[in-house]
Swiss-Prot record:
GO molecular function list: ATP binding; ATP-dependent DNA damage sensor activity; damaged DNA binding; mismatched DNA binding
Family listed: Belongs to the DNA mismatch repair MutS family.
HAMAP family: MutS (MF_00096)
UniProt keyword list: ATP-binding, DNA damage, DNA repair, DNA-binding, Nucleotide-binding
Binding-site positions, ATP: G608, P609, N610, M611, S612, G613, K614, S615
Function field: This protein is involved in the repair of mismatches in DNA. It is possible that it carries out the mismatch recognition step. This protein has a weak ATPase activity.
Pfam families in the record: MutS_I, MutS_II, MutS_III, MutS_IV, MutS_V
Cited SUPFAM superfamilies: DNA repair protein MutS, domain I (SSF55271), DNA repair protein MutS, domain II (SSF53150), DNA repair protein MutS, domain III (SSF48334), P-loop containing nucleoside triphosphate hydrolases (SSF52540)
GO (cellular component) term, any one: cytosol
Name of the protein described by the UniProt record: DNA mismatch repair protein MutS
GO BP, one annotated term: mismatch repair
TM annotation in the entry: none
Length: 857
């Protein structure tokens, strides 16, 4: 911003700093407030509901201004971050009272959506990931980190599809990108209101080199270096807690795209946008924040390695079999605080005394947790017990040094225990003795003057003084005191002896406070040196917490251990239940169902009425698969499952109206993801494909998709449909079987059995469902009449056919017989038209030609 001739030195300083952060709100510290100026003030006042005022109001060009108190700044920063903005925190770097000229100021941190480490209530079990994407000739190098926990991972993705899946899985709010980025890539990355932050090319940093030293892929190392450079530029402090980058491959886990995650309500309810009534909420009996975060990661990335799955299952079984040991473990875990984020605050330099007490309390639980592990049978627990480091030296240091109930502030004293430092104790003794001297002086002055209400007080303006009420002033001996201040009802006095003692007290107090802060910083640095040990312990405790959670939920919900097999794709689930629906309805009200798909069945074609449970049945299988491959027990009587590599879904009319995509377009995009990427080891759930377009278009597409999946993909597929004509495909597709959700009519009413039965449904019961929905009786009667007429007119064919024509209700007595293909050229032409091979445009042109011929007649 160009300098104005009328700018004050302070505004000149502000503008120079603001020019370095043009895309951020600059919170400029002045005394006890952070001030916003110019456009920041105008926009900030609106977003933060602040009073907009002005600096130099009487000038021709007053400067818009708004401010927030320094003690409440974080809440205002959080609001701006939630709106997707960045905030630069500009602090006074020297005491204004001691400054010569302008107070020095500098930005100490740039807070961004991906780097905000302030954890809101209710978000302790969530990660805040910042990601980095670096395009290259063969794909995209991709890294992500959680600044609050130190987690850092990296991979190399070969396609936009894979990149979009990773971004959706991490729910990232900010992506760091290089300066050279195509418009196409930028548009893709911005989807979902993500913030793109450009990191210019820079020399590798020592921190970036350290965390990337184990990486062998140059592209992965480069994207990690870019991300670390951005974090150093924004955080402007130690990042010692950021762990060495771990390379991973998404293909090593069960992959799900954004549609599958949304449709299955794994981590977030697709209807409410919240955690409630999700698979995560159901399985979350974790006792620690870090355990809750790891549970999310396990559900988001189920395993493919059958041996690794078996290890988790064995551990869950062992905890399930040892109720009392599990209860003791849970009791100890409830006293373990968030070790990952405590380590992060230590590295950042923001840890306070209470944080250290939380750390000590957590570490004090480890010996008892080790004892529990020693009582369990599984060998992995005994190995974990021997590897677990209780970090007792850190716990002992904090126990010796920090007050059990310390203040929040680290600069005002009261932090360090007596006995930890001899010099500090001497300062405290001096203060204590001096204060005792003052108490004795007060008593002696009362005796000498006879004024029993005489008091020695202290304030920051006058220091120590003697206060005498006006009614007792005549009792003071002449020349005994020096008058300092006159009040309405009292006089304040000092003596040379009192001021001398005051100097000693204040010097001791100031020295004591300064020494305490120095000692605290030294303690913090000693803890900081052990961050890697604390992070290793946190990972072990997190894993234990998730395993006990799986065991607890399995016991409470009557889950069974699934059998996992490799080599075949057979599915054998007996008495399966949808875990979330069962939880909502209650176990006694839920009707279980089997899913049997052996080597001779790749596809179940599901028919039945609306609201009968087709979608629930399909989701049920997918959730059982996810739970099993995450290592959890599952809601079933028996579950024998293969290892699935991917899950694809098309469930519900998830219109993307904001992006101008219709229901049918969403259907086709989601279907195409499965058709393009599924393998024989994938699981596909398609619900009502084709309903978003004209009847025969939809039926034709549905049949073509079924045939393609059956003949070319060979994935296990559950395909529900209202096109009953498609059920005849079982005659020509050897590995397709029909099943339906049972329903019966009783006294004209429809009763859903919610039970899956072999064979196709005999009808859809659509009018009965409309009756349940409360449609008017006259309307339902009319619909029933039309339905019977349509059924009477429809050709008796088992394959998809052209839509039946509704005849006029009143016909001429002398009406000519209907033409047949033998005597009608148009009908002959229509009969020969290959609907399955035609595109929608071909069909429209064909109908247009027929209309022209008919109009000529």
């Amino acid at each position: 911003m160009p300098q104005k001739t009328s700018e004050t030195p302070m505004m000149q300083q502000y503008n120079e700093i603001k020019a370095q952060y043009p895309d951020a709100f600059l919170f400029y510290r002045i005394g006890d407030f952070y001030e916003l100026f110019n456009d920041d003030a105008i926009k900030g006042a609106q977003l933060l509901e602040l009073t907009l005022t002005a600096r130099n109001k009487s000038a021709d060009d007053p400067i818009p201004m708004a401010g927030v108190p320094h003690h409440a700044v974080q809440s205002y920063v959080d609001i701006l971050i939630d709106h997707g903005y960045k905030v630069a925190i500009c602090e006074q770097m020297e005491d204004p009272k001691k400054a010569v000229g302008m107070v020095k100021r500098a930005v100490i941190q740039l807070v961004t959506p991906g780097t905000n480490v302030d954890i809101k209530a209710g978000a302790a079990k969530s990660n805040n990931y910042i990601t980095a994407v670096m395009p290259h000739a063969a794909g995209y190098a991709f890294a992500y980190a959680d600044v609050s926990t130190g987690e850092l991972k990296v991979t190399d993705l070969k396609s936009k599809f894979a990149l979009q899946n990773e971004l959706s899985a991490l729910a990232t709010k900010e992506i760091v990108v290089p300066e050279e980025l195509t418009d196409d890539d930028a548009g893709m990355l911005k989807q979902g209101e993500r913030l793109l932050s450009v990191q210019p090319d820079a020399e590798p940093t020592s921190e970036g080199s350290y965390v990337s030293q184990a990486l062998t892929d140059p592209a992965e190392a480069a994207v990690v270096q870019m991300l670390m450079a951005y974090l150093l530029n924004t955080q402007k402090r130690s990042l010692a807690h950021i762990q060495k980058a771990v390379a991973y491959q998404p293909s090593a886990y069960l992959e799900m795209d954004q549609d599958a995650r949304s449709n299955l309500d794994i981590l977030q309810n697709s209807r409410t946008g919240r955690k409630g009534d999700t698979l995560l909420s159901l399985l979350d009996s974790t006792k620690t924040a870090m355990g809750g975060r790891l549970l999310k990661q396990w559900l988001d990335r189920p395993l493919l390695d059958i041996d690794a799955i078996s290890v988790r299952q064995n551990q869950v079984q062992d905890l399930l079999d040892h109720f009392f040991e599990r209860s003791e473990l849970q009791e100890r875990l409830t006293k373990v605080y968030d070790l990952e984020r405590l380590a992060g605050r230590v590295a950042f330099g923001t840890v306070n005394g209470r944080d250290l007490i939380q750390l000590q309390t957590s570490l004090d639980q480890i010996p008892a947790i080790q004892d529990v592990l020693g009582k369990l049978d599984d060998g992995s627990f005994k190995a974990l017990r021997s590897k677990m480091d209780p970090v007792s030296d850190v716990a002992g240091l904090i126990r010796r040094a920090i007050e059990p109930e310390p203040p929040i502030s680290v600069t005002d004293g009261g932090l360090i225990l007596r006995g930890y430092n001899q010099k500090l104790d001497s300062y405290r003794d001096a203060m204590k003795n001096s204060k005792q001297w003052i108490a004795e002086l007060e008593a002696s002055e009362r005796k000498a003057t006879g004024i029993h209400t005489l008091k020695i007080r202290y304030n920051k303006v006058f220091g120590y003084f003697i206060e005498v009420t006006k009614s007792n002033l005549d009792k003071i001996p002449e020349g005994r005191y020096e008058r300092k201040q006159t009040l309405t009802n009292a006089e304040r006095f000092i003596t040379p002896e009192l001021k001398e003692k005051e100097t000693l007290i204040l010097e001791a107090q100031e020295s004591s406070t300064a020494l305490e802060y120095d000692l605290f910083q030294d303690i913090r640095d000693k803890v900081k040196a052990q961050i890697k040990r604390l992070q290793a312990l946190a990972a072990q405790i997190s894993s234990l917490d998730v395993l006990q959670s799986f065991a607890t939920v399995a016991e409470n919900s009557h889950y069974v251990r699934p059998t996992m097999h490799a080599g075949t794709h057979d599915i054998n689930v007996k008495g399966g239940r949808h875990p979330v629906v069962e939880h909502v309805l209650g176990r006694d009200s839920y009707i279980p169902n089997d899913v049997i798909m052996n080597h001779d069945t790749d596809m179940l074609l599901i028919t039945g009425p609306n609201m009968s449970g087709k979608s629930t049945y399909m989701r049920q299988l997918a959730l059982i698969v996810i739970m099993a491959q995450a290592g959890s027990f599952v809601p079933a009587d028996v579950a024998d499952l293969p290892i699935f590599d991917q899950i694809f879904t098309r469930i519900g009319a998830a219109d993307d109206l904001a992006n101008g995509e219709s229901t049918f377009m969403v259907e086709m995009l989601e279907a195409n993801a499965a058709l393009s990427h599924a393998t024989a080891s994938s699981l596909i759930l398609f619900d009502e494909i084709g309903r978003g377009t004209a009847t025969y278009d939809g039926m034709a597409l549905a049949q073509a998709i079924i045939e393609f999946l059956h003949d070319h993909v060979h994935a296990k597929t559950l395909f529900s449909t209202h096109y009953h004509e498609l059920t005849s495909l079982s005659d020509s597709l050897a590995k397709l079987k029909n099943v339906h959700v049972g329903a019966v009519e009783e006294h004209g009413n429809l009763v859903f059995l919610h039970k899956m039965m072999p064979g196709p449904a005999d009808k859809s019961y659509g009018i009965h469902v409309a009756k349940l929905a409360g449609l008017p009786a006259d309307l339902l009667a009319r619909a029933d009449t039309i339905l019977k007429q349509l059924e009477a007119d429809a050709p008796n064919k088992t394959a998809p056919a052209p839509a039946p024509q509704v005849e006029e209700q009143q016909l001429s007595l002398f009406e000519e017989p209907k033409p047949t293909p033998k005597n009608s050229p148009i009908l002959t032409k229509l009969a020969k038209f290959d609907l399955m091979a035609a595109t929608p445009m071909d069909a429209m042109n064909f109908i247009f030609d027929l209309q022209k011929h008919l109009k000529k007649k």
